[in-house]
């Protein structure tokens, strides 16, 4: 198997050409692919298996299971709309095709997060639809010292989850239950602050680091999705519309502040997004491709698209 690399800014994607048809995979071939993938992940943080020829969810599940690590079988507490397809395999998102999904580290707002993300393209879109990636160390290094310090002090992710009718996801959908005791146990174990609202909704605040140490390199890396949780991230004028429909920012489905409660300024958000654009790498999907992402090292997103796109994901 041969590999090549592609680089944008400080982000490098390793492309491993498997050069094997879907019906020619055997255990020896998979062992070779897994070994090469681990080596490349250690070097670059993201690897694309090109030509893997994965045809369906069943084959993807079998392939991912062989990489080791227990598959995460529940997305409880997650804010992204997605569907479960089989044990440990989900749609990557149900977010509308006409919108981009900005760069982020998966579940960085949670107490626990996946180490690795495995994406597989079962149907490639007509246009767009790539899963862009961005090196977290490069992103952090592109920010001014003062901004790095503010994120290093931490961020607070705030949610208002309605009880069945309202903006955004309900707490029932978010936590996959209508049992308040189950929700309270989950949030308590997560170290989150929470309170039930008089209208049946739920307020949640999670204090998390904005920067973490990357054990692979020993250096600090960006690890948050604060800009994604800010209403200015919403497409078109939806952020302003949401603000006009609520009495307070605390009633927004998502809201984020620095650790001391200070809101993120427009200038800070602009600086973060400019750095993301500088280091964002885009590689179009081909049917059967598999992309493996070290979640602590590399951010990912989704480009808007046309046509039919089916990209599934597993997490370990």
What are these regions (language model features)?
Residues 1-29, 42, 97-103, 112-316:
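Active-site environment of non-heme Fe oxygenases that use a 2-His-1-carboxylate facial triad
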Residues 34-53:
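TRNA-binding/sensing appendages of the translation machinery
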Residues 54-69:
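Glycine-rich loop at the start of a catalytic domain that most often binds anionic cofactors/ligands
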Residues 55, 109, 299:
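Glycine-rich nucleotide phosphate-binding loop and flanking beta-alpha elements
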Residues 67-71, 107, 121-125:
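Generic hydrophobic/packing signal
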Residues 74-105:
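A gly/proline- and charged-residue-enriched helix-loop-helix capping module
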């Amino acid at each position: 198997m041969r590999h090549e690399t592609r680089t944008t800014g400080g982000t490098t994607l390793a492309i491993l050409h498997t050069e094997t048809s879907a019906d020619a995979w055997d255990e020896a071939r998979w062992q070779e692919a897994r070994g090469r993938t681990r080596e490349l992940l250690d070097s670059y943080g993201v690897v694309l298996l090109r030509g893997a020829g994965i045809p369906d969810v069943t084959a993807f599940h079998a392939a991912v299971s062989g990489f080791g690590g227990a598959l995460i079988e529940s997305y409880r507490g997650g804010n992204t709309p997605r569907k479960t397809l089989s044990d440990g395999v989900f749609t990557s998102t149900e977010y509308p095709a006409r919108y981009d999904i900005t760069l982020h580290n998966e579940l960085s707002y949670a107490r626990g997060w996946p180490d690795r993300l495995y994406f597989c393209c079962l149907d490639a879109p007509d246009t767009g639809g790539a899963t862009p990636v961005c090196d977290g160390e490069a992103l952090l290094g592109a920010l001014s010292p003062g901004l790095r310090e503010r994120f290093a002090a931490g961020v607070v992710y705030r949610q208002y989850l309605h009880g069945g009718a309202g903006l955004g996801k309900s707490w029932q959908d978010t936590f996959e239950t209508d049992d308040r005791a189950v929700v309270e146990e989950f949030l308590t174990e997560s170290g989150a602050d929470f309170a039930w609202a008089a209208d049946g909704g739920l307020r949640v605040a999670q204090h998390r680091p904005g920067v973490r140490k990357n054990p692979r390199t020993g250096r600090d890396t960006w690890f948050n999705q604060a800009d994604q949780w800010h209403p200015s991230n919403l497409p078109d004028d939806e952020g302003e519309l949401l603000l006009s429909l609520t009495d307070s920012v605390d009633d927004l489905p998502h809201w984020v502040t620095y650790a001391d409660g200070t809101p993120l300024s427009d200038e800070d958000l602009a600086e973060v997004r400019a750095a993301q654009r500088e280091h964002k790498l885009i590689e179009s999907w081909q049917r059967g491709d598999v992309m493996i992402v070290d979640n602590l090292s590399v951010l990912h997103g989704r480009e808007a698209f046309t046509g039919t796109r089916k990209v599934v994901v597993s997490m370990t």
